[in-house]
């Protein structure tokens, strides 16, 4: 078995780690950074950019730069009304599916495809670092992700060419990292506030056992929302002062979003910061600039409702675990947004103790995923992970009521059955709607899928015995089976239909990704070839100038002609010619050294021949 990596596929940034020498290690990307921006962009010429390089050009290319895509993955139209307003790119909805428009390619992408590009970048860089091709991974998801979001994340891995061995919850992964070497039993609360999601989990940790007691969260709450509060404040203030709505200008909106994020980060260490955006817009009177001072107090005032929302899952998780705050031994902070001082103060107020800050909030989840990867690969022994399902699962019964079969916070993997009957006489079939959520009525919960059991024996209402079995695997992904006891007729559904992508689409995207991999590699090779050739031209000109009086006229003319040819091929992008001429030019540059050495030798010999040695002779007597 090759190396199995652990991946934290984040809303803002992503991290990849692996077990090396029995220790989890974060793998730096090709640029040397330990985190990779979860951003994908396409240039006007169709080139794909992933990571920090994509983020850097977002202001000049807002419609083709895709960020925070994790907030759309596995979701349907009616679930993204809040998030859709916060992006500078165009999110399309058709029926229940979500697509991201890419004007540069005149193409629409599924969120899973964009996430797959980030995963592919992480895995390619890891393969280079490890010296072997990585094909297997453990990927983390927010604990409060529902079934469709988990399945969509797995689909993204598949599109990226990965065999996703396990999907695990981010707080659980963080606990693996925190508690790996802990011998004593501790009750910990993991507070995970990332860029787009928020989770709280309560766990018992110690002596190799990691048992999740409860989990709660909000998949519509994260650092992006804190940024958005600043953005909306700036837009409102500018409109009042200048009469211009910056929210309608995609480029201005992208600049505001970046400035808001920067201000939020700076206010974690400073009590005030400046937002300066020159030439934010223009009127007939000339350019307009945005200058604003933001204090930490103002930021906390703008985000007070979000900070209050963060306390709700904490209280719910404690309640579900049947614990008082005083029972918590340690609070582990995860996610970049936990650096906000008001968040740390809120956690301290709720739990009654200072949060433990011994772990890196940006890397702890990926490190924990690497530990789980090590367990699956057989590299890590004596670890038992007992996770839970975050939301209740059940079926629709008479009157539009949700009947729960597996309650939330049930340890997984698990399997449970319930026997139901019919509500009418002699039905030829029954339709079973699978639901996820905590509300009493079907309409208030999420429908994961519907399937039909045919061939039921004619019988009065209440007589047929239909056994419905729910089976949740270690990834938290559900399959459901219905069986009519009298006839033995059986029907099952794996809730992959909960994914927003049909199976055929996933397979098509996998194929496209494989085809594009070769194209991307060729583009990368061409860029490298071009850069090397331009550098070679510069070096050649420099050497000709430096050794002008020491090389033959013929060699000088030959090199100058090759430089001209190479520059011409570079302009025409004739990559085969570029490689061929580059090789000839390199050989010619080697001749410079030989030529110069021969000239040096001749000069030295000539000097020796011309030298007259003066001395005194005495007459011998």
Swiss-Prot record:
Keywords: ATP-binding, Chaperone, Chloroplast, Nucleotide-binding, Plastid. One of its GO terms (molecular function) is ATP binding. Residues 596-621 are annotated as: Disordered. Pfam families: HSP70 (PF00012). It is found in: Plastid, Chloroplast. GO terms for cellular component: chloroplast. SUPFAM superfamilies: Actin-like ATPase domain (SSF53067), Heat shock protein 70kD (HSP70), peptide-binding domain (SSF100920). Residues 611-621 have a biased composition (Acidic residues). Transmembrane segments: none annotated. Residues 600-610 have a biased composition (Basic and acidic residues). Belongs to the heat shock protein 70 family. Acts as a chaperone. This is Chaperone protein dnaK. It comes from Pyropia yezoensis. The gene is dnaK.
């Amino acid at each position: 078995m090759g190396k199995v990596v652990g991946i934290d596929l984040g809303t803002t940034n992503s991290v990849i780690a692996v077990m090396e020498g029995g220790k989890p290690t974060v793998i730096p990307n090709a640029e040397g950074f330990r985190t990779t921006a979860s951003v994908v962009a396409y240039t006007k010429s169709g080139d794909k950019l992933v990571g920090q390089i994509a983020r850097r050009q977002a202001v000049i290319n807002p419609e083709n730069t895709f960020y925070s895509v994790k907030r759309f993955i596995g979701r349907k139209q009616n679930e993204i009304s809040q998030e859709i307003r916060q992006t500078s790119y165009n999110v399309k909805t058709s029926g229940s599916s979500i697509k991201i428009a890419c004007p540069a390619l005149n193409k629409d992408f599924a969120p899973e495809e964009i996430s797959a590009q980030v995963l592919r970048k992480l895995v390619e860089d890891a393969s280079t670092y490890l010296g072997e091709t990585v094909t297997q991974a453990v990927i983390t998801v927010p604990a409060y992700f529902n079934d469709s979001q988990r399945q969509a994340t797995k689909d993204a891995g598949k599109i990226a060419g990965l065999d996703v061995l396990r999907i695990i919850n981010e707080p659980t992964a963080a606990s693996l990292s925190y508690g790996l070497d802990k011998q004593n039993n501790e009750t910990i609360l993991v507070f995970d506030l990332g860029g787009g999601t928020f989770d709280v989990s309560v766990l018992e940790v110690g002596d190799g056992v990691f048992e999740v007691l409860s989990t709660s969260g909000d998949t519509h709450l994260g650092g992006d929302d804190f940024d958005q509060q600043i953005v909306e404040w700036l837009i409102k203030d500018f409109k009042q002062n200048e009469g211009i709505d910056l929210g309608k200008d995609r480029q201005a909106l992208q600049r505001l979003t970046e400035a808001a994020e920067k201000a939020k980060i700076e206010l974690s260490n400073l009590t005030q910061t400046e937002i300066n955006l020159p030439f934010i817009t223009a009127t007939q009177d000339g350019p307009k600039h945005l200058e604003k001072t933001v204090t930490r107090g103002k930021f906390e005032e703008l985000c007070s409702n979000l900070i209050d929302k963060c306390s709700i899952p904490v209280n719910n998780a404690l309640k579900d675990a049947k614990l008082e705050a005083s029972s918590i031994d340690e609070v582990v902070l995860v996610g970049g947004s936990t650096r906000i001082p008001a968040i740390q103060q809120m956690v301290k107020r709720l739990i009654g103790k200072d949060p433990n800050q011994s772990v890196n909030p940006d890397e702890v989840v990926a490190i924990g995923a690497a530990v789980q990867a090590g367990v699956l690969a057989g590299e890590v022994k004596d670890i038992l992970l007992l996770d839970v399902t975050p939301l209740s699962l059940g079926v629709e019964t008479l009157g539009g009521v949700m009947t729960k079969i597996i309650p939330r916070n049930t340890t997984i993997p698990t399997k449970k059955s319930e026997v139901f009957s019919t509500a009418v006489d002699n039905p030829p079939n029954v339709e079973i709607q699978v639901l996820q959520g905590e509300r009493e009525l079907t309409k208030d919960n999420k429908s994961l899928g519907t399937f039909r059991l045919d061939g039921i024996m004619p019988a009065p209402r209440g007589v047929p015995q239909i056994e419905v079995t729910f089976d949740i695997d270690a990834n938290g992904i559900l399959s459901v089976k219905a069986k009519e006891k009298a006839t033995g007729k059986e029907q099952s559904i794996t809730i992959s239909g909960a994914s927003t992508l049909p199976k055929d689409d996933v397979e098509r995207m996998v194929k496209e990704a494989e085809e594009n991999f070769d194209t991307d590699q060729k583009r990368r090779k061409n860029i490298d070839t071009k850069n090397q050739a331009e550098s070679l031209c510069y070096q050649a000109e420099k050497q000709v100038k430096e050794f002008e009086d020491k090389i033959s006229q013929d060699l000088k003319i030959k090199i100058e002609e090759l430089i001209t040819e190479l520059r011409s091929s570079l302009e025409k992008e004739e990559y085969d010619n570029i490689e061929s001429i580059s090789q000839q030019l390199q050989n010619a540059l080697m001749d410079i050294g030989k030529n110069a050495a021969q000239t040096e030798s001749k000069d030295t010999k000539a000097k020796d021949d011309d030298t007259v040695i003066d001395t005194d002779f005495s007459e011998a007597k």
